[in-house]
């Protein structure tokens, strides 16, 4: 097959593996593309090669390309389009390439959800869904679930003799609520939807608990836990072996050897039992007996070695003790009874899940909405049907897609889930050896398990496929990295060769997986990777875990700030590919990567204190903003005024303006009852003189509140919000505060949220407040995000997840000492895709609870998956760096931690012992033991090579490993000597001494004047209208300059509009009609009315503006001589914008600056017509004339001509400059009286 593939062109930039990935065909292909290996370029090139293949070209719409994000899909289309356009330059006559460009926009290059949507839109009639369905908002979805679940549970509570249900409630709810039960039902529903057949998966959960006629050996949980037992016994054996080696040293405790050998024999017996059966291990564990250590005279031996030997033996004994207590303290049949007892309860739970799913789907169907999981399942429903044996097989529709698609290409395949895999399977060929599926990804970068991505799908194929593709699929490794320096790649390899393996990590980091250098860089200074471990001494630690975390963030932030500042100030150089040269590093070249963002605010604050520009998209704090918080309390009070805290907050806010004393006075009027009841009672009585002001404030607010409550029952929520903004004046008030524009923007966002809410299936204020509560419960608060330009010179802070796919010259990975998040393992119930459901055994009657076999197995499995995921997250972080990688972590006691990390230092294999890797609680627990086996850590450890193999100790990588004392970081910076005298003088308020030679310099600076003062009092950009006003202002009048700086009249916000339009708004409406009136149709009342109605529908006019249009005046214009010329003209242009440069003295009568200065002039010409003999310019005016001038139009004419002469002259200049043709005539048309003025120069 290889011989039939096109050969790589001479001088090609593609590597052999990349070229193979571009041209290989004839079977399913899996490309394992390491970080920075150019996978997107390969994918695009493969598509192009298929499209322009001379022998067998494929139309682009016969390819299905699945991407992870919409942005990736658009980028793919853009790249393919650009590549096709390049081909067209070389082959301008190619109709095939032109056809591909026209097909590209409708090609199936999209996310999996977009493809699902395309299938559903085409075959909706095969489903019970409204073809006009919409995608549900996530919060709306959550509220619907809540509503459905509440109804189901209410029904269950009302059923008599519902014994099993009430047992379920007793076991899994508290005295106060059934929230835990609701969480269980929702979690099971969500997990089931990640499987192609949700009901089948749920049924398997129940079947696993049906242990009738089974032994413990038949349980999948026991089989898995036995593997874990072997793992822990092996760990114990390693401890004893290590202790034996130490005891055999010349000054080791030799009398311990006999006991240690007995320990090894005991552990060997247990391990042999574990290889047999659960029952065998149980029996062996009951007979465990450790020999007592013989007394020795410690002074005869090396005391440190004795301690190490005893410590290792105790660790081994603890491993066995832990197994005894967790797994083998109960008889096997006791575990089986747990399953029997829980089976009917779990069966009832699963029944509730199925009922919930059915009703939830029905409610969404009634509301014409679907969610993203529905898209996948509906698509799968269309593409599959059930075979006779109950399995899923391709439907007729799926077979049509198989025939249509010549190839299916999947990007980021490592992030695919089970349902998506089934969809892909049904639209591709059955046989892997003759398949048409091309998959690209890197399982080492699969970091979305929390979104139900399944890296096992990639791993399964990677193990099954071969590099030759014989008898099945083909795998291709793209290991060359074209992003990073050797130091970054070698440093990453050195760590991952030691920590990532199949048993712990799910992936073998072997020779194929290693990163290989593909980029070339000039020689650089200080490019070694670094590990900076900060020692946080006990004296520094603030009381409490939260305080300690804050301090760790501060320590690491200060260290990073010092390093960034030093690198920038010293001119540290990075390579610039655009100029092919080294350049000084800039702030934008740095990124700080964090596992999550809680530390980001402290890091930002510290960097800002050091004068370092920094940006982080915190995406939090919106609902904590004062103005939003106050408004939310207003709406809570409108919904239910009996809530004391929201009402007190509103009364105390600037809206009502009560002070603490007034609030206390009000409360004193009624010590019982709610604030609202007390306020109502207070307002009914006559106030005392000293309470009159309080009474007036409360009466004003009380009346508003009653009006709002009435309004809320009848009108839309968004209208209510604008009503509150307008009637309280709060929107205008916050605009006058510091950061006023931002505050107003926050209030507008709240209004937008309300409109989004009203676009869902929910209505009403109460539900909106619940909607917001759910957003906050899910942690979906919004931040004041801003668009950040790629070239903006700031240090970026982001999560490792956000950084995926990005690259930066200098990367700090911080927070490496923070513990992994294991909260999911602590839940009362656990779910797993393979092992199903596990929870504690709870007997409410006996009031006992304990861990079950299923819970132990699932917890262990989830922990190993979490460890593997965290390894992959660390891999993503380290591979973002192009030139310099700096790792930072903080520990409480570096000496104690180093002792732990050094345990495996002399391990003889590349891969660290399983227990070291599986027992890690933070990234440092992997990084430090790895680096402490490298020669570059010698200066820190002073231990020598010992028995570390040469290939590890001398591995070709450069590292700087340093322990930093936290005290030095927290110490205030020393004050420079030359500043001391100045500081003392300022403290004592004395005159500051000044050297005489600097007096003149200081005087000159204080008396300096800007040389272009004239320019500062005139704008550099003007509109024609502003220039016209400048000419109209009286020569030399005192207020001429003030008029120039007067704020322009702004359009009124809609929420503040009163009935009727202003003169300016009427004029705008008339101009809009004159711009859009159809000159090809007869100008009649009926036709103009029809056209104006159309403008309202298109939102070109409001209804109010349309009502104010005097149609007869528009008709009068077209009946006039000038109007008839417009209708008969060769061409007519309306609302023509222009920009031109104009001499400053022409724009400003009072200009006294230098000649030759220019300003930018902008304007819009109402109408220009081209006739046989030239161009005529027309400006429409809605000025009031009739009745305003005693002498009528004749008196008005010279005044109006003077008023608008400058404006029309500038219009004419602009036209003549742009058209290179003189304007023959300039006309003003006044609608009031149907008058025309021809303006002469």
From Swiss-Prot:
It catalyses: Couples ATP hydrolysis with the unwinding of duplex DNA by translocating in the 3'-5' direction; ATP + H2O = ADP + phosphate + H(+). Its cofactor is Mg(2+). Keywords: ATP-binding, DNA damage, DNA repair, DNA-binding, Exonuclease, Helicase, Hydrolase, Isomerase, Nuclease, Nucleotide-binding. ATP binds at residues 33-40. Residues 12-485 form the UvrD-like helicase ATP-binding domain. The heterodimer acts as both an ATP-dependent DNA helicase and an ATP-dependent, dual-direction single-stranded exonuclease. Recognizes the chi site generating a DNA molecule suitable for the initiation of homologous recombination. The AddA nuclease domain is required for chi fragment generation; this subunit has the helicase and 3' -> 5' nuclease activities. This is ATP-dependent helicase/nuclease subunit A. It comes from Bacillus anthracis.
């Amino acid at each position: 097959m290889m011989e039939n593939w096109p050969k790589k062109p001479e001088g090609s930039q593609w590597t052999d593996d990349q070229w193979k990935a571009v041209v290989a065909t004839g079977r399913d292909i899996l490309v394992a593309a390491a970080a920075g290996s150019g996978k997107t370029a390969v994918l695009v090139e493969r598509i192009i090669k298929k499209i322009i293949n001379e022998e067998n070209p494929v139309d682009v719409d016969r390819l299905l390309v699945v991407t992870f994000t919409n942005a990736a899909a658009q980028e793919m289309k853009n790249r393919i389009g650009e590549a096709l356009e390049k081909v067209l330059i070389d082959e301008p006559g190619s109709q095939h390439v032109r056809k591909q460009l026209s097909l590209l926009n409708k090609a199936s290059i999209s996310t999996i959800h977009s493809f699902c949507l395309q299938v559903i839109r085409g075959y909706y009639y095969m489903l019970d869904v409204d073809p006009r369905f919409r995608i549900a908002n996530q919060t709306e979805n959550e509220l619907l679930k809540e509503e459905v679940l509440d109804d189901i549970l209410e029904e269950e509570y009302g059923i008599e003799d519902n014994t099993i249900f009430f047992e379920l409630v007793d076991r899994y709810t508290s005295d106060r609520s059934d929230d835990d039960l609701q969480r269980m039902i929702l979690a099971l529903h969500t997990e089931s939807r990640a499987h192609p057949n949700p009901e089948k998966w749920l049924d398997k959960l129940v079947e696993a608990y049906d242990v009738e006629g089974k032994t413990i050996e038949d349980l999948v949980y026991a089989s898995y836990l036995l593997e874990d037992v072997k793992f822990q016994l092996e760990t114990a054996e390693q401890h004893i072996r290590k202790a034996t080696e130490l005891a055999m040293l010349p000054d080791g405790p030799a009398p311990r050897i006999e006991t240690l050998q007995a320990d090894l024999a005991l552990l060997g017996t247990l391990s042999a039992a574990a290889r047999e059966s659960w029952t065998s291990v149980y029996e062996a564990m009951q007979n465990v007996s450790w020999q007592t250590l013989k007394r020795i005279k410690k002074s005869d031996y090396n005391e440190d070695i004795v301690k190490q030997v005893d410590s290792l033996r105790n660790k081994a004994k603890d491993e066995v003790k832990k197994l005894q207590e967790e797994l083998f303290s109960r008889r096997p049949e006791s575990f089986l009874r747990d399953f029997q007892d829980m089976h009917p309860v779990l069966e009832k739970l699963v029944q509730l899940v199925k009922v919930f799913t059915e009703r939830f789907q029905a409610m969404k169907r009634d509301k014409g909405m679907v969610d993203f999981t529905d898209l996948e399942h509906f698509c799968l429903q269309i593409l599959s049907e059930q075979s006779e044996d109950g399995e899923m097989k391709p439907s007729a529709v799926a077979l049509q897609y198989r025939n249509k698609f010549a190839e299916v290409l999947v990007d980021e395949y490592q992030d695919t889930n089970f349902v998506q895999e089934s969809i892909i399977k049904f639209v591709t060929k059955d046989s892997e050896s003759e398949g048409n599926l091309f998959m690209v990804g890197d399982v080492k970068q699969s970091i979305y398990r929390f979104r139900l991505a399944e890296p096992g799908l990639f791993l399964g194929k990677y193990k099954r496929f071969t590099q030759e593709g014989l008898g099945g699929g083909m795998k291709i490794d793209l290991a060359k990295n074209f992003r990073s320096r050797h130091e970054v790649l070698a440093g990453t390899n050195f760590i991952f060769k030691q920590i990532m393996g199949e048993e712990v990590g799910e992936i073998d980091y072997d020779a194929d997986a290693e990163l290989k250098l593909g980029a070339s860089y000039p020689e650089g200074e200080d490019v070694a990777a670094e590990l900076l471990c900060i020692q946080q001494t006990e004296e520094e630690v603030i009381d409490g875990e939260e305080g300690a975390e804050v301090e760790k963030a501060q320590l690491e932030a200060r260290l990073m700030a010092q390093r960034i500042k030093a690198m920038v100030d010293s001119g540290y150089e990075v390579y610039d590919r655009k100029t092919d040269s080294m350049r000084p590093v800039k702030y934008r070249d740095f990124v700080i990567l964090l596992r999550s963002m809680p530390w980001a605010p402290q890091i930002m604050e510290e960097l800002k204190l050091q004068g370092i520009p920094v940006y982080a998209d915190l995406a939090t704090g919106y609902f904590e903003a004062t103005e939003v918080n106050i408004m939310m309390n207003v709406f809570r009070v409108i919904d239910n005024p009996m809530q004391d805290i929201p009402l007190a907050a509103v009364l105390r806010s600037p809206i009502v303006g009560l002070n603490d004393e007034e609030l206390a006075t009000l409360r004193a009027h009624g010590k019982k009852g709610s604030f609202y009841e007390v306020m109502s009672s207070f307002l009914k009585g006559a106030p005392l003189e000293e309470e009159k002001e309080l009474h007036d404030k409360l009466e004003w607010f009380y009346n508003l509140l009653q009006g709002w409550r009435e309004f809320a029952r009848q009108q839309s929520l968004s209208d209510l919000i604008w009503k509150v903004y307008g009637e309280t004046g709060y929107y205008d008030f916050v605009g006058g505060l510091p950061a006023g524009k931002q505050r107003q923007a926050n209030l507008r966002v709240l209004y937008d949220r309300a409109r989004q809410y009203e676009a869902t299936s929910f209505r009403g204020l109460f539900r909106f407040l619940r909607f917001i509560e759910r957003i906050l419960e899910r942690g979906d608060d919004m931040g004041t995000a801003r668009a950040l330009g790629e070239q903006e010179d700031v240090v970026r802070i982001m999560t490792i997840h956000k950084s995926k796919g990005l690259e930066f010259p200098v990367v700090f990975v911080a927070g490496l000492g923070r513990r992994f998040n294991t909260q999911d393992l602590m839940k009362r119930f656990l779910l797993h895709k393979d092992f199903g459901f596990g929870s504690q055994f709870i007997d409410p009657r006996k009031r006992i609870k304990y861990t079950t076999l299923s819970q132990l197995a699932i917890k262990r499995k989830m922990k190993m998956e979490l460890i593997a995921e965290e390894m992959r997250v660390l891999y993503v972080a380290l591979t973002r760096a192009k030139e310099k990688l700096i790792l930072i972590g903080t520990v409480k006691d570096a000496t104690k931690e180093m002792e732990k990390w050094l345990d495996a230092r002399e391990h003889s294999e590349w891969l660290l012992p399983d227990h070291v890797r599986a027992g890690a609680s933070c990234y440092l627990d992997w990084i430090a033991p790895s680096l402490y086996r490298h020669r570059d850590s010698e200066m820190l450890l002073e231990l020598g090579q010992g028995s570390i193999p040469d290939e590890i100790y001398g591995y070709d990588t450069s590292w700087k490993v340093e322990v930093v004392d936290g005290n030095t970081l927290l110490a205030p910076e020393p004050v420079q000597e030359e500043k001391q005298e100045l500081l003392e003088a300022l403290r004592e308020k004395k005159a500051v001494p000044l050297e005489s030679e600097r007096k003149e310099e200081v005087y000159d600076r204080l008396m300096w004047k800007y040389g272009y003062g004239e320019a500062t009092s005139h704008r550099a950009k003007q509109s024609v209208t502003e220039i016209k006003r400048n000419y109209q202002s009286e020569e030399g009048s005192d207020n001429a300059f003030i008029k120039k700086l007067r704020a322009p009249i702004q359009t009124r916000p809609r929420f503040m509009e009163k009935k009727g339009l202003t003169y300016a708004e009427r004029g705008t409406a008339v101009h809009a009609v004159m711009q859009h009136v159809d000159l090809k149709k007869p100008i009649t009342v009926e036709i103009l009315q029809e056209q104006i109605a159309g403008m309202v529908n298109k939102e070109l006019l409001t209804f109010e503006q349309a009502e104010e249009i005097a149609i007869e005046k528009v008709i009068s214009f077209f009946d006039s001589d000038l109007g008839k010329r417009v209708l008969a003209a060769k061409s007519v242009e309306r609302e023509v914008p222009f920009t031109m440069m104009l001499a400053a003295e022409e724009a400003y009568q009072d200009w006294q600056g230098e000649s030759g200065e220019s300003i930018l002039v902008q304007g819009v010409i109402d109408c220009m017509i081209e006739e046989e003999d030239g161009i005529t310019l027309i400006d429409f005016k809605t000025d009031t004339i009739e009745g305003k001038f005693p002498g009528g139009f004749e008196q008005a004419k010279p005044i109006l001509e003077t008023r608008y002469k400058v404006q029309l002259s500038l219009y004419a200049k602009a036209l003549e400059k742009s058209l290179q043709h003189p304007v023959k005539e300039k006309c003003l048309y006044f609608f009031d009286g149907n008058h025309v003025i021809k303006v002469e120069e």
